[in-house]
């Protein structure tokens, strides 16, 4: 066979291969519904990029009882990134009381006002205290009995690198009506987290739904205006994050019907940063179902 025939054969084979490549399905649903989900996704991207979003987390440091000095110098109890002052100050933890004292010559701001000595409120109080110097922002988180510093850098390089999150094609078939089955009394369920610990949470009931002729059930957690669902499925660890995804719903209607719209299921913050403390799905919320809706994995971690 001469060279020209070999080249033609190769080109033909490549053409056939590309032609046989499975095309991703088009969005399915009314134009209004598709636009609604696209708008939700765009707002999700914008929230991630905000100063309060998950993309700019650059540190998580657990505090010990007593004094905890921090800054970029190795001499501190806690070493901040190199773009911070050598010593920013000290956080004193005494029982559950936290106090910040700044180092000399360092401008630390709270609500744009310079502070040198301040009592700190953690994130679970609803009135957390945020401190700032330069492009760094930090506040106290409480997880169980532990207190830690969560650090952000509003000029973190990832903010420039981050563009979007892949999602499955929008498909209104994944907008499913579920029946809310109350627990009386509410059931205590175990919620593991990425730190390796487990906490109990109240589940007011389960959400029962049918897909492809099979029945499935998810334990719900009460949220401000409805339910919060942490779930994993047969895409987890393959096309989506291995530790599951999150989904919020509205409250049940008068017939105890709740809409589960898996097109707005999304990645937990641990996908984007190792400094988040994500809850994981309770074992009963691992579904033997491939949910091809919502956000796919971001980055290389599964």
Which positions does each model-derived feature cover?
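N-terminal beta-hairpin/loop module of FHA
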Residues: 32, 36-84, 234-235
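Bacterial signal peptide processing site
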Residues: 21-23
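C-terminal motif of bacterial Sec signal peptides marking the signal peptidase cleavage site
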Residues: 16-19
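Bacterial N-terminal signal peptides that target proteins for export
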Residues: 1-8
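Extended, aromatic/histidine-rich regions of cofactor-dependent oxidoreductases associated
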Residues: 161-167, 236-238, 257-259, 263-302
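Flexible, glycine-rich surface segments
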Residues: 177-236, 241
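Surface-exposed beta-loop interaction hotspot
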Residues: 132-199
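Forkhead-associated
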Residues: 63-128
């Amino acid at each position: 066979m001469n060279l020209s025939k070999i080249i033609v054969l190769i080109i033909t084979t490549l053409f056939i291969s590309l032609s046989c490549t499975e095309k991703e399905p088009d969005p399915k649903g009314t134009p209004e519904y598709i636009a609604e989900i696209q708008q939700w996704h765009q707002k999700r991207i914008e929230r991630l990029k905000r100063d309060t979003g998950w993309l700019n987390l650059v540190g998580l440091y657990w505090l010990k009882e007593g004094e905890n000095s921090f800054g970029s110098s190795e001499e501190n109890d806690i070493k901040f990134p190199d773009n911070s002052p050598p010593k920013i100050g000290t956080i004193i933890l005494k029982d559950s009381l936290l106090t910040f004292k700044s180092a000399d010559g360092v401008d630390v701001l709270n609500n744009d006002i310079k502070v040198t000595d301040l009592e700190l409120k953690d994130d679970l109080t609803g009135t957390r205290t945020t401190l700032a110097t330069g492009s760094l922002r930090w506040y106290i988180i409480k997880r169980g009995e532990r207190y830690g510093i969560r650090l952000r850098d509003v000029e973190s390089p990832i903010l420039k690198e981050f563009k979007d999150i892949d999602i499955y094609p929008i498909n209104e078939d994944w907008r499913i009506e579920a029946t809310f089955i109350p627990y009386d009394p509410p059931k205590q369920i175990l919620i593991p987290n990425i730190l390796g610990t487990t906490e109990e949470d109240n589940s007011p009931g389960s959400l029962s739904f049918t897909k492809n002729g099979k029945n499935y059930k998810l334990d719900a957690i009460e949220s401000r205006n409805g339910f919060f669902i942490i779930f994993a499925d047969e895409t987890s660890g393959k096309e989506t994050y291995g530790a599951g995804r999150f989904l919020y719903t509205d409250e049940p209607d008068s017939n105890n019907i709740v809409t589960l719209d898996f097109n707005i299921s999304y990645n937990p913050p641990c996908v984007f940063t190792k400094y988040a403390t994500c809850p994981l799905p309770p074992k009963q919320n691992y579904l033997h179902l491939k949910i091809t809706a919502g956000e796919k994995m971001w980055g290389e971690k599964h």
